Amino acid sequence: MQALAKHKFASGSAQKARLVADQIRGLPVDRALEILAYSPKKAAVLVKKVLESAIANAEHNEGADIDELRITTIFVDDGPTMKRIMPRAKGRADRILKRTSHITVMVSDS
């Protein structure tokens, strides 16, 4: 059985979050949680929350055994980008791009 969890509009770029997602793809969930707990990246905190949600979904909705679960699918898509203006010298302005991402984690016991 499979359980899914998503975090949409997560702050942070998808490119940076994919670095974390690539580290835990295909691992057992207990090993993945250990890796995420000691990762210094901001995206690791976001991915860990989504993974914990997927584990809770599998346990509550499907009645799965937590010790059997593995991460079968994890991917990070681009979300909408917010455009902001930063004033600069001599009346100029720079555009700031505040990127968001959509994090999806699927766990399975097979």
UniProtKB/Swiss-Prot annotation:
For this protein, the record's Pfam families field holds: Ribosomal_L22
PANTHER family the record matches: CHLOROPLAST 50S RIBOSOMAL PROTEIN L22-RELATED (PTHR13501), LARGE RIBOSOMAL SUBUNIT PROTEIN UL22M (PTHR13501:SF8)
Output the Gene Ontology terms for molecular function: rRNA binding; structural constituent of ribosome
Q: Which GO terms describe its cellular component?
A: cytosolic large ribosomal subunit
The UniProt entry, under PROSITE patterns, shows: RIBOSOMAL_L22
What is this protein's function per UniProt? Answer: This protein binds specifically to 23S rRNA; its binding is stimulated by other ribosomal proteins, e.g. L4, L17, and L20. It is important during the early stages of 50S assembly. It makes multiple contacts with different domains of the 23S rRNA in the assembled 50S subunit and ribosome.
Q: Which HAMAP family match?
A: Ribosomal_uL22_B (MF_01331_B)
What processes does the entry annotate via GO biological process terms? translation
> Does the record carry RNA-binding as a key word?
yes
- Summarize subunit and interaction data from the UniProt record for this chain: Part of the 50S ribosomal subunit.
Family statement: Belongs to the universal ribosomal protein uL22 family.
Which InterPro entries does the entry mention?
Answer: Ribosomal_uL22, Ribosomal_uL22_bac/chlpt-type, Ribosomal_uL22_bac/org-type, Ribosomal_uL22_CS, Ribosomal_uL22_sf
Question: What keywords are assigned to this protein?
Answer: Ribonucleoprotein, Ribosomal protein, RNA-binding, rRNA-binding
Q: What is this protein called?
A: Large ribosomal subunit protein uL22
Which superkingdom?
Answer: Bacteria
